[in-house]
From Swiss-Prot:
It comes from Danio rerio. It is an enzyme of class 3 (hydrolase). Residues 346-380 are annotated as: Disordered. Phosphorylated. Phosphorylation upon DNA damage induces relocalization to the nuclear plasma. Residues 336-344 are annotated as: Interaction with PCNA. Belongs to the XPG/RAD2 endonuclease family. FEN1 subfamily. The keyword Ribosomal protein does not apply. Signal peptide: none annotated. This is Flap endonuclease 1. Residues 122-253 are annotated as: I-domain. The keyword Phosphoprotein applies. PANTHER family: FLAP ENDONUCLEASE 1 (PTHR11081:SF51), FLAP ENDONUCLEASE FAMILY MEMBER (PTHR11081). Mg(2+) 2 binds at residues 179, 181, 233.
């Protein structure tokens, strides 16, 4: 779900923190990608006659086609992607997960009604609401990435939190996701639309966290409290407090505790047993991969393995998969040239509270840590 209305709030109150770029602007960048969000996008977008792609055995293949071709597109643009998969959800998320089950049940009813009435537009709409990323989808995508030579990480908990940890450790430039809570977890740079379909022609939106805090005149903890007021996955919100009122209250009182002391509980009741402190703790100190010990490697594709998996097992066209392998190999030859700016700073590792550039010594130190074996690293 992410954070309700946060992107618009940032656009209204900190527009200079958002930049728009084409994909070619990220040549030479290492980017951590929220894998579950990508797979969900592929299951919705990669369709034929309104249905997910399937092979002759009735197995869904939309996620594999999307992952294969969108990853190749990034590699051809000189990007080094690392996919981060969700681990176990935090206990606080159980309420949100229950709501999702209820919404799915409602969508199933509406889909049945639309099918009975022959309403194709509603059939498409409610079919997409029933899309769910399964463990099998995840495992098949991990296998595909390994065969493509692209690294992936299994996060201990929320993928966006571990993406942010990789950014803060200087291992990657940015977190790529459509969920804005990557910023709440403290990623210094967040990218939206990186994995969107080329046909949509959406520019990539780049959000800079330090500039957001600066322009909104908030600390990181105040920003987290703002996100909780807007609505997150971990707890409810105060009734009748919209985005504009939320930011005004945070600026006026500085914290949720002070806001609760100063608003009328009859007009604006807080949820019973409101777990906002626990939600704040999850954002401030999430369970994440150890970013400093992760060793990311991008390898040559295993062409024979890809043909066996994608063609023999999943029934993709052999010509297309071999052509994709050639593109991956060619992209590796072109991506050996680095970005000029990476010779001077470790991009993406600057704290949101710091404005001065890092010293050359710290950059060398960061470069040395990349040789340390990573506990969660799965690229092969």
């Amino acid at each position: 779900m992410g954070i309700h209305g946060l992107a618009k709030l940032i656009a209204d109150h900190a527009p200079s923190a958002i930049k728009e770029h084409e994909i070619k602007s990220y040549f030479g960048r290492k980017i951590a990608i929220d894998a579950s969000m990508c797979i969900y996008q592929f299951l919705i977008a990669v369709r034929q006659d309104g249905n997910v792609l399937q092979n002759e055995d009735g197995e869904t293949t939309s996620h594999l086609m999307g992952m294969f071709y969108r990853t190749i597109r990034m590699l051809e643009s000189g990007i080094k992607p690392v996919y981060v998969f969700d681990g176990k959800p935090p206990q606080l998320k159980s309420g949100e997960l229950e709501k999702r089950v209820e919404r799915r049940a409602e969508a199933e009813k509406l889909l049945a009604q639309a099918q009975e009435a022959g309403e194709q537009e509603n059939i498409d709409k409610f079919s997409k609401r029933l899309v769910k990323v399964t463990k099998q989808h995840n495992e098949e995508c991990k296998k595909l990435l390994s065969l493509m030579g692209v690294p992936y990480i299994e996060a201990p908990c929320e993928a966006e939190a571990s993406c942010a940890a990789l950014v803060k450790a200087g291992k990657v430039y940015a977190t790529a996701t459509e969920d804005m809570d990557g910023l709440t977890f403290g990623t210094t740079v967040l990218l939206r639309h990186l994995t969107a379909s080329e046909a949509k022609k959406l520019p990539i939106q780049e959000f800079h966290f330090s500039r957001i805090l600066q322009d909104m005149e908030l600390t990181h903890q105040q920003f987290i409290d703002l996100c909780i007021l807007l609505g997150c996955d971990y707890c409810g919100t105060i009734k009748g407090i919209g985005p504009k009122r939320a930011i005004d209250l945070i600026k006026q009182h500085g914290s949720i505790e002070e806001i609760l002391e100063n608003i009328d509980p009859n007009k604006h009741p807080a949820p019973e047993d409101w777990l906002y402190k626990e939600a704040r703790g999850l954002f401030l100190e999430p369970e994440v991969v150890d970013g400093t010990s992760v060793d990311l490697k991008w390898n040559e594709p295993d062409e024979d393995g890809l043909i066996q998996f994608m063609c023999a097992e999943k029934q993709f066209s052999e010509d297309r998969i071999r052509n994709g392998c050639k593109k991956i190999t060619k992209s590796r030859q072109g991506s050996t040239q680095g970005r000029l700016d990476t010779f001077f700073t470790v991009t993406g590792s600057i704290s949101s509270k710091r404005k001065e550039p890092e010293t050359k010594g710290s950059a060398k130190k960061k470069q040395k840590t990349s040789a340390t074996p990573g506990k969660f690293k799965k690229g092969k």
